[in-house]
Every structure is written in C-alpha cells, then in structure tokens.
C-alpha cells in the first residue's frame, strides 16, 4: 500500500510537474505518458511473473520505436528533458498499476484516501526542504488557483481515480 501510494500519489505528480516545467510545448508530455501501458506490462512481467505474448512484445517494441521516431520532430527535440520526465511519470504510473493488483481486496475509498494522505504528507515534506516558505506560499494562493485545486481534488481524485481503482479489481495490467 505504501509503495502504491508513493508511486501513484508522489512520483506521478512530481514527474508530471517536472515534465511540464521543462517542456515548452505539451507534446512531449502527451507522448511520454503513452508509455504507461508498455511500462505497466513490462513491470507486471518482472514483478508478478506474468507471461507476455509475442504480440504484446511487438506492441511494446512498436510503442518505444514510435516515440523515438516522432521525437525527431525539431520542435520536440528541444524538449528532451520534458519527455524524459514524462516517461518517468509513465513508469511510475505503470508501477502503480502493478502494485494495485496486490490491493484488490481493499475498499477503493480507503485506497484513494491512503494515496491522497501519503502523497500530501510526502510532497509537503519535500516542499519544506526544496521550496522553503511553504506555508507562506500556500497562504498566498489566489482564489482562482484554489478553484483549480478543488477541481483536481473532486473530479480527478474522487471521480476518475476511484473509478480507476475500482476497475483494477477486475482487470489485469
């Protein structure tokens, strides 16, 4: 549960924000995030011993080659660091999918609450050490930003993540 929470609640968001910071356009983030499924399949083979069919190996290979081919576009070549962090985000998400397989028996509300709590605490501690003045920064957030944060918390965390965690109970990575 802790590994899942760190992977999903901390690493995905850290790498997503780093990829946004280091990209001048959104394309590298979209491209890198497409690797979540291939990373998840590879992680399930390594960590859970699942068999990967030759068809899936071909699709995984095609996904990585496709990213390499697309990335020769000159606009994307200047955003390599953004793609790198987006790929790490996809890897973290893929790992969280594998970890979730072991958490099928937990209630999805408990799972979502634990991910949120661990993510909040770890990111808050990291923020204190890296950013300094964390409380001052939180207090200075304007109302429009709080509305966006509320949307993220309600629609994404309570809606989409709960549904995703629910589906993890029934489907393989």
Language-model regions: role of each:
Residues 20-36, 79-91, 144-154:
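Structural signature of hydrophobic alpha-helical transmembrane segments
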Residues 13, 37-45, 60, 67, ...:
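Hydrophobic transmembrane alpha-helices of multi-pass small-molecule transporters
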Residues 11-17, 68-79, 120-135:
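Hydrophobic alpha-helical transmembrane segments in multi-pass integral membrane proteins
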Residues 1-32, 69, 153-171:
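Specific transmembrane alpha-helical segments of multi-pass solute transporters/efflux pumps
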Residues 43, 52-72, 89-91, 123:
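Hydrophobic transmembrane alpha-helices of multi-pass small-molecule transport proteins
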Residues 19, 46-48, 52, 103, ...:
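Hydrophobic/aromatic residues within transmembrane alpha-helices
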Residues 24-25, 48-53, 107-108, 172-173:
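A helix-boundary/kink motif common to multi-pass secondary transporters
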Residues 3, 59-62, 81-85, 104-157:
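Hydrophobic alpha-helical transmembrane segments of multi-pass integral membrane proteins
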């Amino acid at each position: 549960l802790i590994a899942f929470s760190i992977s999903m609640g901390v690493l995905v968001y850290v790498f997503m924000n780093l990829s946004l910071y280091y990209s001048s356009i959104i394309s590298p983030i979209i491209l890198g995030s497409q690797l979540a499924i291939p990373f998840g399949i590879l992680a399930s083979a390594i960590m859970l011993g699942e068999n990967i069919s030759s068809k899936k190996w071909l699709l995984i290979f095609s996904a990585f080659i496709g990213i390499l081919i697309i990335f020769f576009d000159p606009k994307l070549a200047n955003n390599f660091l953004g793609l790198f962090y987006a790929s790490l985000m996809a890897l973290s998400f893929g790992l969280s999918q594998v970890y979730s397989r072991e958490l099928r028996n937990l209630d999805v509300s408990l799972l979502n609450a634990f991910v949120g709590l661990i993510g909040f605490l770890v990111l808050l501690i990291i923020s204190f050490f890296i950013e300094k003045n964390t409380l001052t920064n939180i207090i200075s957030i304007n109302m429009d930003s709080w509305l966006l944060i509320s949307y993220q918390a309600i629609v994404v965390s309570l809606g989409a993540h709960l549904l995703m965690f629910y589906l993890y109970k029934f489907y393989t990575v």
